[in-house]
Each structure stands twice: as C-alpha cells, then as structure tokens.
C-alpha cells in the first residue's frame, strides 16, 4: 500500500515512517509539510491512503481534506494528529469533509508492540480492507403504520458528519419521528460526535445504548465497533455478527434488521460514503414497501455508498443534501 504523509513536524513524520516500515507491504510514497503541497502531491502521485495532520501551515488538514476529496478520484484519508480528544471538533469537521477515521500520532521510540504504533497500523489495515472490498470505489406491500412518525434510518460514512449536521440542523423542532444513525466511526469518537451533532440541531442527539427504544424527536447514534440491530421486541442491541465485514458498525446489518422486526413505517436514507455498505439494506427496505432516499453525486463528499444504491435501484428518491431534511419532514407528516 502506497502511503502519503502530511505533517510539518519532523519527529511525527519519523515516528510514522518507522511504524509503516514494520509492514513490508506498505511504503511511504511521499511526505508533504503543508496543506497546499498535500493537495498537489495527491493529484500528481495519488497514494492509496493519506495520513493527514490537522494543524499545519498555510491551510489546515480540514481544508486539505476538503480539497483532496473534490477530484474525480479522491484519496482515502486517515487523520493522524496529536491529542485527538482535545481536537475532537476538528476531527469531526475533517470527517465531514471526507476523512474516514482518526488516530493519535504514534510516539517516536514506541516499539512494534507499542499501543500508538499498533493503533496506527490497525487503522491502516482497516481502511485497506475497505478499499479492497467488492464494489469499493478507489476511490411488495407497505408496512403497517406505528403510532408515532416513521422511523428514520440513516447510514453514512466518509463525509457523513457534515451531511448529518446539515440534515438534523434543518429538521423542525417538533419533528415527531425517531431517528437512528449508523455512521462509520470509531467507538472512541462516537460519544463526542453525538455531542457535536446535538449542538447542530434542535432535536436531542445521543449515543444508542443496549436496550434503547427509538423515541420520537430523538436521534440515536450507533456507538460501538459492533453492529447495531433492532430486535423483535423493538429495542436496540449490539452484536459482533456478522464478523466478516469491513464495515463496523454496518449500515446493511441495521437496515436488514428493520425489514425483519420493525412493525411500523421506515424511511431509509443513505448518505455520502466510500464503498457500498447500506446499498443492499436500502434495497431490502424498498422491496418491503418503505420509502428510501440516497444522496446525489453532486453533494456527496464521496459518491460510493449512494452510487451503489442508485445502481441497485434501491433509492426511490435521489436528492441533493439540501433537500433531504425537507423531504423527511414532509414524509413524517403523512
């Protein structure tokens, strides 16, 4: 795997070089020390993955991510920066621009068994599996009605935080439908992302806990590296199965559980993201008679998951991001 490093600190660059050198199948393709240089190198010598710092000269990692994700063939981006916790809002902004995940910068002198080195290599491996997954871009009758509004099921990956903030922020305060969100995000960031999204909307947003029931006007965010499912009893549960999937939590797993167990209406929404997770599940929802929506290409940070849904005929409506909240509000009133 060819890897680009974007970081202006020599010690951090050396620590990443040493970590990458422990895997013979990986090599450092180039090193950029600022945002503009990173954008130029991604265009001239596209790597398989970019290790992107957040705080740099000229323009930061958020803007660099945004510009790198604009071309026809964007690069996979992993945020690698110091003090992830202190920079949580920047991490979410970068993920909203298309970054896939985030991890702390490895420490120089950290051996092969060191925690920071292991975490970095594990994240690189995880993204590698995602890139190699089939369909990944390198980049019937209606269901019975429930008493409240329909359950809104949303799946997202790269670019998802920003898209979710836009949709949730444009829903009315009296929106009377439960929302469950499956966003590809490490469990370490789920709580912070829920808090960040909660500040973008008049609705309540929090992480989904084992045994929760979807509630009108509340958005629940999948919060672990396990899959989220709805049970026959109408509660949420986390499960390790299926184990053989590059996506954790998986949008498909959640969508498919709704077709099996949810007694009321469902509106399925598939947003920006790399790969094809959620496309088959969205198709199952549509075949069950539920309304399904996919984000359009023009407004997607990464047109992978919604493209797969469109190809399968899984989406009843393909909409720009700015129209999705209004569509949900209108459908919830029906």
From Swiss-Prot:
Protein's GO biological process: chemotaxis
Catalytic activity line of the entry: [protein]-L-glutamate 5-O-methyl ester + H2O = L-glutamyl-[protein] + methanol + H(+); L-glutaminyl-[protein] + H2O = L-glutamyl-[protein] + NH4(+)
CDD domains recorded: CheB_Rec (cd16432), REC_CheB-like (cd17541)
Highest taxon of source: Bacteria
GO molecular function: phosphorelay response regulator activity; protein-glutamate methylesterase activity; protein-glutamine glutaminase activity
Posttranslational modification: Phosphorylated by CheA. Phosphorylation of the N-terminal regulatory domain activates the methylesterase activity.
4-aspartylphosphate modified-residue sites: 53
Annotated coiled-coil segments of the chain: none
Active site (record annotation): 157, 184, 277
Protein localization: Cytoplasm
Cellular component terms per the entry's GO annotation: cytoplasm
Assigned keywords, A-Z: Chemotaxis, Cytoplasm, Hydrolase, Phosphoprotein
Enzyme Commission number(s) from the entry: 3.1.1.61, 3.5.1.44
InterPro entries given in the database record: CheB-like, CheB_C, CheY-like_superfamily, Sig_transdc_resp-reg_Me-estase, Sig_transdc_resp-reg_receiver
Domain Response regulatory: residue ranges: 2-120
The CheB-type methylesterase domain, residue ranges: 134-334
Family the entry assigns: Belongs to the CheB family.
Cited NCBIfam families: PRK12555.1
Alphabetized PANTHER family for the sequence: PROTEIN-GLUTAMATE METHYLESTERASE/PROTEIN-GLUTAMINE GLUTAMINASE, PROTEIN-GLUTAMATE METHYLESTERASE_PROTEIN-GLUTAMINE GLUTAMINASE
Function: Involved in chemotaxis. Part of a chemotaxis signal transduction system that modulates chemotaxis in response to various stimuli. Catalyzes the demethylation of specific methylglutamate residues introduced into the chemoreceptors (methyl-accepting chemotaxis proteins or MCP) by CheR. Also mediates the irreversible deamidation of specific glutamine residues to glutamic acid.
Domain notes: Contains a C-terminal catalytic domain, and an N-terminal region which modulates catalytic activity.
Protein's name in the database: Protein-glutamate methylesterase/protein-glutamine glutaminase 2
Species this protein is from: Burkholderia orbicola (strain AU 1054)
Phylogenetic classification of the source organism: Bacteria, Pseudomonadati, Pseudomonadota, Betaproteobacteria, Burkholderiales
């Amino acid at each position: 795997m060819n890897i680009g490093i974007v970081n202006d600190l020599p010690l951090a660059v050396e620590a990443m070089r040493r970590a990458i050198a422990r895997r013979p199948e990986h090599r450092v393709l180039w090193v950029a020390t600022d945002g503009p240089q990173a954008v130029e190198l991604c265009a001239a010598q596209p790597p398989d993955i970019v290790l992107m710092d957040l705080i740099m000269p000229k323009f930061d990692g958020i803007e660099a991510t945004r510009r790198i994700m604009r071309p026809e063939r964007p690069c996979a981006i992993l945020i690698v920066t110091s003090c992830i916790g202190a920079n949580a809002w920047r991490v979410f902004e970068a993920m909203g621009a298309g970054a896939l995940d985030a991890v702390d910068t490895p420490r120089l002198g950290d051996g092969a068994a060191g925690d920071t080195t292991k975490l970095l290599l594990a994240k690189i491996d995880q993204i590698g599996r995602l890139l190699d997954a089939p369909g990944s871009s390198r980049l019937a009758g209606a269901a019975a009605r429930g008493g409240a509004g329909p359950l809104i099921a949303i799946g997202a990956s790269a670019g998802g935080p920003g898209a979710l903030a836009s949709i949730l922020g444009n829903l009315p305060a009296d929106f009377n439908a439960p929302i469950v969100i499956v966003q590809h995000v490490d469990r370490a960031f789920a709580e912070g992302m829920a808090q960040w999204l909660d500040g973008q909307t008049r609705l309540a947003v929090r992480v989904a806990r084992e045994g929760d029931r979807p509630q009108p006007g509340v958005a629940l965010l999948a919060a672990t590296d396990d899959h989220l499912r709805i049970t026959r009893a109408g509660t949420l549960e986390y499960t390790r199965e299926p184990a053989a999937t590059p996506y954790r939590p998986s949008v498909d797993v959640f969508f498919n559980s709704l077709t099996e167990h949810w007694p009321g209406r469902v509106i399925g929404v598939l947003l920006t993201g790399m790969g094809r997770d959620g496309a088959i599940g969205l198709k199952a929802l549509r075949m069950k008679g539920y309304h399904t929506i996919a984000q359009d290409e023009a407004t997607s940070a990464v047109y992978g998951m919604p493209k797969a849904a469109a190809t399968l005929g899984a989406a009843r409506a393909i909409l720009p991001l700015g129209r999705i909240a209004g569509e949900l509000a209108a459908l919830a009133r029906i």
